Amino acid sequence: MEDKRVAMLVVMMLVMGNMLIEAEAVMSFKLCYGGCLVACALIAPPIKKLFCPFLCIKDCKRRPMLSFEANLNEIDQTGSYCELGCATDRCVSSSSIDDKGYYVNFSGIMWRKFHYAWIHAQKSAPTRTKIAIDFSL
């Protein structure tokens, strides 16, 4: 009984942590700049505190716009779907019974096709980034 409670607690913490990261990623420029300025004022050495506003502007402006921050009417996701579908189709088309005797050559071909599909899947997948504040000059 105790193991189930611990497992439920761990799952709940993972879900809440994921929600926290999602909420943190949607931060606007004002929130990013304010938090960065406070953190810089508390952490940076006295001489570098003069550069805090400039460092924070640089770090908060550099933050990429995430896919869910963009206007959803302007996003055309059919191109991404077609790239991923085309890449997957190229991988699947090589896996037939006729290739059974050519395992060495076939594995090399499949590796190249898998690599191609992986690259296109990474291009079409939305990315999650965390911005790190760099206090070094």
Curated annotation (Swiss-Prot):
Keyword set includes Signal: yes
Keywords: Disulfide bond, Plant defense, Secreted, Signal
UniProt cross-references to InterPro entries, sorted A to Z: THNL
Modifications made to the protein after synthesis: Is disulfide-linked.
Family according to the record: Belongs to the plant thionin (TC 1.C.44) family.
Entry function: May be involved in plant defense.
Protein name: Thionin-like protein 1
Species lineage: Eukaryota, Viridiplantae, Streptophyta, Embryophyta, Tracheophyta
